[in-house]
Design a protein with these regions (language model features):
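Residues in the recognition helix of alpha-helical DNA-binding motifs
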Residues: 32, 43, 72
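N-terminal flexible/basic segments that precede or flank functional cores
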Residues: 1-9, 16, 21
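DNA major-groove recognition helix of helix-turn-helix/homeodomain DNA-binding modules
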Residues: 54-68
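Short, charged recognition helix plus adjacent turn
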Residues: 1-6, 60, 71-73
Length: 73
Protein backbone atom coordinates (compact mmCIF):
# COMPACT_ATOMS: atom_id res chain seq x y z
CA UNK A 1 0.00 0.00 0.00
CA UNK A 2 1.30 3.45 -0.90
CA UNK A 3 0.95 6.34 1.51
CA UNK A 4 0.91 10.00 0.66
CA UNK A 5 3.70 12.05 2.21
CA UNK A 6 1.01 14.41 3.44
CA UNK A 7 -0.92 11.71 5.27
CA UNK A 8 -0.69 12.18 9.02
CA UNK A 9 -0.92 8.90 10.90
CA UNK A 10 -1.11 8.42 14.61
CA UNK A 11 -1.23 5.48 16.96
CA UNK A 12 -4.02 5.07 19.47
CA UNK A 13 -3.62 2.67 22.33
CA UNK A 14 -5.58 0.98 25.10
CA UNK A 15 -2.74 0.82 27.64
CA UNK A 16 -4.56 2.94 30.24
CA UNK A 17 -7.78 0.93 29.92
CA UNK A 18 -5.97 -2.41 30.21
CA UNK A 19 -3.84 -1.23 33.11
CA UNK A 20 -6.89 -0.01 35.04
CA UNK A 21 -8.81 -3.21 34.25
CA UNK A 22 -5.89 -5.19 35.68
CA UNK A 23 -5.59 -2.97 38.75
CA UNK A 24 -1.94 -2.15 38.06
CA UNK A 25 -0.15 1.10 38.78
CA UNK A 26 1.93 2.90 36.18
CA UNK A 27 5.00 1.97 38.22
CA UNK A 28 4.08 -1.73 38.23
CA UNK A 29 3.57 -1.78 34.47
CA UNK A 30 6.79 0.15 33.91
CA UNK A 31 8.77 -2.32 36.02
CA UNK A 32 7.16 -5.28 34.25
CA UNK A 33 8.17 -4.06 30.79
CA UNK A 34 11.48 -2.41 31.72
CA UNK A 35 10.79 1.30 31.27
CA UNK A 36 10.21 4.31 33.51
CA UNK A 37 6.85 5.37 34.88
CA UNK A 38 7.23 8.55 32.82
CA UNK A 39 7.37 6.45 29.64
CA UNK A 40 4.11 4.71 30.58
CA UNK A 41 2.51 8.10 31.28
CA UNK A 42 3.61 9.39 27.86
CA UNK A 43 2.31 6.26 26.09
CA UNK A 44 -1.05 6.47 27.87
CA UNK A 45 -1.42 10.16 26.95
CA UNK A 46 -0.51 9.44 23.33
CA UNK A 47 2.59 11.62 23.54
CA UNK A 48 5.02 8.78 22.85
CA UNK A 49 4.90 5.96 20.32
CA UNK A 50 6.63 2.90 21.76
CA UNK A 51 9.18 0.90 19.82
CA UNK A 52 8.02 -2.39 18.35
CA UNK A 53 9.90 -4.20 21.11
CA UNK A 54 8.19 -2.21 23.86
CA UNK A 55 4.77 -2.60 22.23
CA UNK A 56 5.31 -6.36 22.13
CA UNK A 57 6.38 -6.42 25.79
CA UNK A 58 3.25 -4.50 26.76
CA UNK A 59 1.10 -6.87 24.70
CA UNK A 60 2.73 -9.90 26.32
CA UNK A 61 2.23 -8.39 29.78
CA UNK A 62 -1.50 -7.98 29.15
CA UNK A 63 -1.70 -11.30 27.25
CA UNK A 64 -3.26 -9.54 24.26
CA UNK A 65 -2.28 -9.38 20.59
CA UNK A 66 -0.35 -6.18 19.95
CA UNK A 67 -2.92 -5.04 17.38
CA UNK A 68 -5.66 -5.15 20.06
CA UNK A 69 -3.68 -2.61 22.11
CA UNK A 70 -2.12 -0.37 19.46
CA UNK A 71 -4.09 0.84 16.43
CA UNK A 72 -2.92 2.94 13.49
CA UNK A 73 -5.43 5.71 12.73
Amino acid sequence: MLYSLHMQETIQNKVYTLRMRNGATQEELANAVGVTRQTIIAIEKGNYTPSVLLALKIARHFQQPVEKIFTLV
